Amino acid sequence: MAACTAQVLSLYRKLMKESNKFPSYNYRTYALRRVQDAFRANRSVEDPKMVEQLLNQGRDNLDMIRRQVAIGKMYPTQKTIVEG
């Protein structure tokens, strides 16, 4: 279980780090909030099969975030008032 916990924490850190790379404030805050909410919602899951399934889903989401960040950097937009 310790290895599993380490994998979950590693995935969480990677997701948060990648989500912070969004150039757009709105996308960045949305992605960060979604990652936090998903991990909080599944905090009590202990079934190894379910944990593995959630890890795979998280890895897929990490790949998606990386692609979206790359696309967002290719097509920059004007900063919002919140971004200053």
From Swiss-Prot:
Transmembrane segments: none
GO cellular component: L-cysteine desulfurase complex; mitochondrion
InterPro entries, per database record: Complex1_LYR_dom (IPR008011), Complex1_LYR_LYRM4 (IPR045297), ISC_assembly_LYR (IPR051522)
GO biological process: iron-sulfur cluster assembly
Highest taxon, organism lineage: Eukaryota
Pfam families: Complex1_LYR
Family per record: Belongs to the complex I LYR family.
Protein name per Swiss-Prot or TrEMBL: LYR motif-containing protein 4B
Organism: Salmo salar
Lineage of the organism: Eukaryota, Metazoa, Chordata, Craniata, Vertebrata
Gene this protein is translated from: lyrm4b
